[in-house]
From Swiss-Prot:
NADP(+) binds at R39, R45. Residues 95-118 are annotated as: Disordered. CDD domains: Chorismate_synthase. FMN binds at R130, S131, S132, N251, A252, G296, K311, P312, I313, P314, T315, R337. The keyword ATP-binding does not apply. GO terms for biological process: amino acid biosynthetic process; aromatic amino acid family biosynthetic process; chorismate biosynthetic process. Belongs to the chorismate synthase family. Its cofactor is FMNH2. SUPFAM superfamilies: Chorismate synthase, AroC. This is Chorismate synthase. Pathway: Metabolic intermediate biosynthesis; chorismate biosynthesis; chorismate from D-erythrose 4-phosphate and phosphoenolpyruvate: step 7/7. Its EC number is 4.2.3.5. The gene is aroC. It comes from Listeria welshimeri serovar 6b (strain ATCC 35897 / DSM 20650 / CCUG 15529 / CIP 8149 / NCTC 11857 / SLCC 5334 / V8). Reduced FMN (FMNH(2)).
C-alpha cells in the first residue's frame, strides 16, 4: 500500500491517491472528516484555522460505503484559495501580478533558501507553498483510512502531547489507548495531565505575545498489535525503522524514540529488557514495555509506544536575521501567517503516519486483496502466536 500527495498551501486544494487497499473494507467520508477536524484543533493555532473547515471529497475507489480494491482518490479544498487566485494562478499572469507576494527573504529554519537553491526558484514562494505543513492535511486523510483498517482488525491508535515548551506532563501510570483518546480529546493541548495542560497553554500564549514559537514532544500508542509485524532479516524490513522515518518526515520533527528511548543509554540491560511471561488466556506478554513494543524490528505483541520531538515553527512574527537573495543585503526574514504552537495538531499527524506504517505492515504480512480474508488471516495469526 502506498500514497502520494499533491497541492500547494494556497492553491485550489490538496490531493492524495492511495493504492493497495483491500476490497470490501467499510469506509465513509465521515471516517476521514473527523480526523481532519481533530488536526485543525488545539490551543495555539493561527488565524487560518478560522478560514479552513476541511472536508474531504472522495472521488474514486469507493462505492456504496466500501472500498473497491482500486486506487482511492481524495481532495480537500483550500477555502483560502479565493484570496490567492492571482498569486497562485496555474495560468500565466501579467508581470506586475507575478511579482505580487514574491518572497526573496528566506526564513531561518525553513525550506525556503535551500529549496530555492535546489530547484532554481528566485521566488521562494514556490518552495514554501509545498513545504508548508498544510500538506499534512492529506497525510491525515490517508492516515484516517489506515486507522479505519486497523480498527476493523482490533488495532487502535491514540496520540497525546507529552511536552510543550519545556513543560512536561507528569504521568504516574500507564494509560490505555481508550483512556488516551478520551482524555486527550477533552484537552485544548491534547495533554493527559491537567496541571501541565494549564502551564502549556500559558507558555503558548506567552510565545504568541512575544512574536515567538515553541515546540514539544508527542507520543503515539498503538494497542492490539499482533506479534510479528516487520522483520529482522533485512535492515529495511524493520517496522520500528519505518515508523521512525515516518515520524521524522512530519514537518518540523527532528527525532523519534521508542519505549524508554534514549533513557536506555543511561540504564543497565537488566533494567531495560522486558521479561517474557506466558498465560493460557493471553499467550506471550512482557512484564514491562521498555522497548516500546519492538524486538528485532518486529512487533512483540505489546503496545507500540513511539515519541517524536517537534522543533518550534520557523515562521516568527518577530523575525530573525536573513539575507535578501536579490541584493544580498541583511534584512529581517519574511513573515507568513502561522501558528505559535502546532504541537497538539502535530500529535494527530503523528497518529496518522504511525497508523499508516502499521497498516502497510499488516497488508505486507497478510493477504490484502479482500478485506474479509484479511480479517480471517489476522485472527488466525493471533491464535497461532498465542499457542506457539
Amino acid at each position: 500500500m502506498r500514497y502520494l500527495t499533491a497541492g500547494e498551501s494556497h492553491g485550489p486544494g490538496l490531493t492524495t491517491i492511495i493504492e493497495g487497499l483491500p476490497a470490501g473494507m467499510p469506509l465513509l467520508a465521515e471516517d476521514v472528516n473527523k480526523e481532519l477536524k481533530r488536526r485543525q484543533g488545539g490551543h495555539g493555532r493561527g488565524a487560518r484555522m478560522r478560514i479552513e473547515k476541511d472536508q474531504v471529497q472522495i472521488t474514486a475507489g469507493i462505492r456504496h460505503g466500501k472500498t473497491l480494491g482500486a486506487p482511492v482518490a481524495m481532495f480537500v479544498e483550500n477555502k483560502d484559495w479565493k484570496h490567492w487566485e492571482t498569486v497562485m494562478s496555474i495560468e500565466p499572469v501579467p508581470e506586475k501580478n507575478e511579482k505580487s507576494r514574491r518572497v526573496s527573504r528566506p526564513r531561518p529554519g525553513h525550506a525556503d533558501l535551500v529549496g530555492g537553491m535546489k530547484y532554481g526558484h528566485n521566488d521562494m514562494r514556490n518552495v514554501l507553498e509545498r513545504s508548508s505543513a498544510r500538506e499534512t492535511t492529506v497525510r491525515v486523510a490517508a492516515g484516517a483510512i489506515a486507522k479505519k483498517l486497523l480498527h476493523e482488525l482490533g488495532i487502535e491508535v491514540a496520540g497525546h502531547v507529552l511536552e510543550i515548551g519545556g513543560t512536561r506532563a507528569n504521568l504516574t501510570r500507564d494509560f490505555s489507548v481508550s483512556e488516551i483518546k478520551e482524555t486527550s480529546e477533552a484537552s485544548p493541548v491534547r495533554c493527559l495531565d491537567e496541571v501541565a495542560e494549564k502551564e502549556m497553554m500559558q507558555k503558548i500564549d506567552d510565545a504568541k505575545k512575544n512574536g515567538d514559537t515553541i515546540g514539544g514532544i508527542v507520543e503515539v500508542v498503538v494497542g492490539g498489535v499482533p506479534a510479528g509485524l516487520g522483520s529482522y532479516v533485512q535492515w529495511d524490513k524493520k517496522l520500528d525503522a519505518k515508523i521512525a522515518r515516518a515520524i521524522v518526515s512530519i514537518n518540523a520533527f527532528k527525532g523519534a524514540e521508542f519505549g524508554v528511548g534514549f533513557e536506555a543509554a543511561r540504564k543497565p540491560g537488566s533494567e531495560v529488557m522486558d521479561e517474557i511471561l506466558w498465560s493460557k488466556e493471553d499467550g506471550y506478554t512482557r512484564r514491562t514495555n521498555n522497548l516500546g513494543g519492538f524486538e528485532g524490528g518486529m512487533t512483540n505483541g505489546m503496545p507500540i509506544v513511539v515519541r517524536g520531538v517537534m522543533k518550534p515553527i520557523p515562521t516568527l512574527y518577530k523575525p530573525l536575521q536573513s539575507v535578501d537573495i536579490d541584493s544580498k543585503e541583511t534584512f529581517n526574514a519574511s513573515v507568513e501567517r502561522s501558528d505559535s504552537c502546532a504541537v497538539p495538531a502535530a500529535s494527530v499527524v503523528a497518529e496518522a503516519v504511525v497508523a499508516w506504517e502499521v497498516a502497510v505492515a499488516v497488508l505486507e504480512k497478510f493477504d490484502g486483496d479482500r478485506f474479509d480474508t484479511l480479517k480471517k488471516h489476522v485472527e488466525e495469526h493471533r491464535n497461532l502466536t498465542k499457542e506457539f
